Regions:
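Conserved Class I S-adenosyl-L-methionine
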Residues: 210-268
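Short alpha-helix
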Residues: 189-205
Length: 268
């Protein structure tokens, strides 16, 4: 890895983060993405989700809920890349904070930030053509009763798509994968396999599952991003977390950790 520091030029940072799998994301200011990240590279993950979710087929101005949007980078991406009218919902980032960032990006008329908790969403049934959630759904969506409530917000036939940190296989018993024990935290039990998620969504009866798959070499993308954030983030907490997660990913080498993509279509 190059010697990235807070003084690394945008040109060098752009070269390092340019990824052939994510051509749309490559067009965004890398410093803006680094400064506004809250975990794995959300733009990369959304770009991976988009084809399976059918975002390009949405009509101009389609209504999209970005659930757990963080600092609204994904919301800006949805408006810019897919001409969507986006509701950017988050619990932790204040709407005024996101509103400033959205306006600076030039999408104040297309992205509406709101403060909302995932179990108390202030929207009417059938309000959205699509729901997107990137690196957030694992924190509230493992509840077996949650998906039917959320998908009522979709028009009939509308799609929900999520990307979550995940495990390649479900652990057997009560212990985490042995090689990950030094880094394992209780919160990681919300990581599940693609099969686990497919089964949970299918059992809900709320959607027809159209995709539940694993990002090949996703751990490498995650590790690359951790290395950049550990060196470049302006926030010490994020630098520390990136170093810790990066150490775990290097040790794992894709044996257990990665990302799962899920897409479901609301049943009539």
């Amino acid at each position: 890895m190059p010697d990235l520091t807070p003084r690394t030029s945008n040109e060098d940072l752009t070269k390092w983060l340019t990824h052939p799998r994510y051509p749309r994301s490559n067009s965004y200011d890398p410093r803006w993405v680094v400064e506004n990240q809250m975990g794995p590279n959300a733009l990369w993950l959304l770009e991976w989700l988009a084809p399976a979710l059918g975002l390009e087929a949405l009509r101009p101005g389609a209504r999209v809920l970005d659930l757990g949007c963080g600092r609204a980078m994904t919301s800006v991406f949805l408006a810019r890349e897919y001409d969507a009218q986006v509701t950017a919902a988050d619990l932790w980032i204040k709407p005024d904070d996101n509103a400033g960032r959205i306006a600076e990006a030039g999408f104040a008329d297309r992205v509406q930030p709101v403060h909302a908790e995932a179990h108390d969403l202030p929207f009417a049934e059938g309000s959205f053509d699509a729901i997107v959630s990137v690196d957030a759904y694992q924190y509230f969506g493992t509840d077996d009763l949650y998906l039917p409530t959320l998908t009522r917000l979709l028009r009939p036939g509308g799609r929900i798509g999520v990307v979550v940190p995940a495990l390649r296989e479900e652990p057997q018993g009560l212990e985490p994968p042995e090689h990950l024990e030094p880094w394992w935290e209780p919160g990681y039990w919300c990581f599940h396999s693609a099969d686990w998620w497919r089964r949970q969504w299918t059992r809900s009866g709320a959607v027809e599952v159209e995709a539940a798959d694993w990002l090949d070499d996703g751990w490498r993308d995650w590790l690359l991003w951790c290395e950049v954030i550990a060196a470049e983030s302006p926030e010490e907490w994020h630098r520390t977390m990136a170093r810790q997660v990066g150490e775990m990913l290097r040790h794992d080498e894709g044996r257990a950790l990665g990302f799962v993509r899920l897409v479901g279509r609301r049943k009539p």
